[in-house]
Amino acid sequence: MRFFLPLTFLLLAAPWPLPACAESINGHDYVSLAGWARANGFGGYAVKGEVFVLTNKTARLLFNKDSADSVINGVNVRLSFPVAKGGFISQLDADKTLRPLLFAPKPAAKRISTICLDPGHGGKDTGYRVGRFFPRSEKTYTLALALELRQQLNQAGFNVMLTRDKDIYPELPVRPDLANRCGADLFVSLHFNAFSTGDPASVQGPETYCITPVGAASSNDAEGAGATHAVCAANRVEDKSLRLAYQMQRALVRSLGATDRSVRRARFEVLRSAQMPAILIEGGYMSHPVEGKKIFDAGYRKQMAAAMVRGILAYQKLTAPPPSKTNPASTNKVSSAKKPK
């Protein structure tokens, strides 16, 4: 099987974003988008209606007035706080969203070898169920996707472990703990969505979640609600998790032609204690009359798994360590890691 690496978003040459003057808005530090743009190599700054546009030779950023919605190089990304009044972005978003996605990361100490896949739900926990007479359970399709993804990741040269490989329910804290104890390099939790109120045809598309930064509310919380300064293990690698989430969402949307429901933040229990880059993917809406049928189709899940492999390969390319002088052509060993007992 051939995998085509999409071009990763072009990173700015500066090693670190420069500060802009901050002011307090609604109890949070904010910086002017225009000032941030000047300080960080964005020669283009324009206001088009209620949209602020920042551009340079390699990047294009869109921010909506009074909204947490942004578009970073063609991918929808939810900010931690809305853009305020005359074009101000929170300092936290400048540091924890723009910096990780636009400025080159330090090379990783080693290549990605082992990936832990977590098929959501299982056993007593069916997850979402759709269909009146012949209900379909989310747990069935997360496992089917995980098994397909494991096969494709093996073919791409990665070791893969699963938190479950049958219809059982590992408790939520157990899932990232398995990844931690096995020294996994990435943790990917697989889920599907459903829309229970209103028109089920009105919502579709994948969402990719990573851990919420300290001091911010999660993407699905009411404005300002849920903000906390508590630190969890996953916050130690939150920049890496955001980069992984971005590359995964980018690959899913582009490969599947799906609606972009954006990169989001959440303090899900399966993410909080992960000691490696960790994301949770909502692969689409089972409740949507068209997308749901695709999710139930093995051929479409195969395409989705291939897109996820592309996302992981793009992240690996972005963070790859320098080539070894003794073995510059080293690659991942192809094997399948068994779940620890």
Feature roles, as predicted:
Residues 5-15:
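Bacterial N-terminal signal peptides
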Residues 5, 44, 60, 105-107, ...:
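Generic marker of residues within folded, mature protein domains
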Residues 136-341:
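Active-site-proximal helix/loop segments of hydrolytic enzymes
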